Amino acid sequence: DGNIWGGEFFLFDGKTMERAGHLEYLPLPGGEASIKKPYRIAAAYGQYLLNEIPAAVFPREYQSELELISKQLDSGFNLAWTSSLGRLFDAASALLLGVCPAITFEAQAAIALENCVDPGITAKYGHQIIQSDGQSIVSLKEMWRQLNDDVKNGIKPGVCSAKFHNTIVDFTLAMCDNLKLKSEIKTVALSGGVFQSRALLGHVQQGLLQRG
């Protein structure tokens, strides 16, 4: 559809595959070039979802770049849209752990986010699943608002990271529940780089097994 996919839910009946849902589309300033600079993604998500870029997260030397990102969102110039879960991890990592000038290896930001998880935290952020054109869309505004509030209130990164991971698990299981009711398909396949995360994969597997 001209957008960058990456947070998709498909139904496969053995013959045909149907895209049944996805994460909501969020802006990616500069397109995939932003992958190397996760703070740009965090700024764009904050501006788009909350009309707020938390200035405390970004040093002063980044202010001119943040202003440019804001103008890109207003004009749509050199702006891609993505449903990527990997980019959501990148943005959350930048928001929680601070600006990393440039990524030097694949999944660097997501790995840093996983490494700081407080395993004793079971709380999670909110989310909403909405229906649009026959598809289930995971709305991320409430999750990002609560995450942003935690950062502003000085909640420890390990707590926020745990709540973020728990939220991903929660909406993944909720989407699987919805698609099971729709299709009666009970087998789930998990793929993509984000499921290299032990914190994420283990909890999703456990939740699926509990659901049968």
Where do the model's predicted regions map?
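A contiguous, well-structured pocket-lining segment that forms one wall/lid of small-molecule binding clefts
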Residues: 41-185, 199-209
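Short helix/loop capping segments that flank catalytic or ligand/cofactor-binding pockets
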Residues: 2-3, 19-20, 92-93
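Short beta-alpha connecting loops at secondary-structure transitions
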Residues: 18-34, 72-77
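Gly/Thr-rich phosphate-binding beta-strand-loop-beta motif of the actin/hexokinase/Hsp70
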Residues: 1-12
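Flexible loop/turn segments at secondary-structure boundaries
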Residues: 1, 30, 91, 196-199
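Active-site proximal loops enriched in glycine and acidic residues that flank catalytic Cys/His/Asp
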Residues: 11-13, 27, 164, 168, ...
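Short acidic-glycine loop/turn motifs at beta-strand connectors
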Residues: 11-16, 96
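Short, intrinsically disordered, charge-balanced linker/junction segments flanking boundaries
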Residues: 192, 208-212
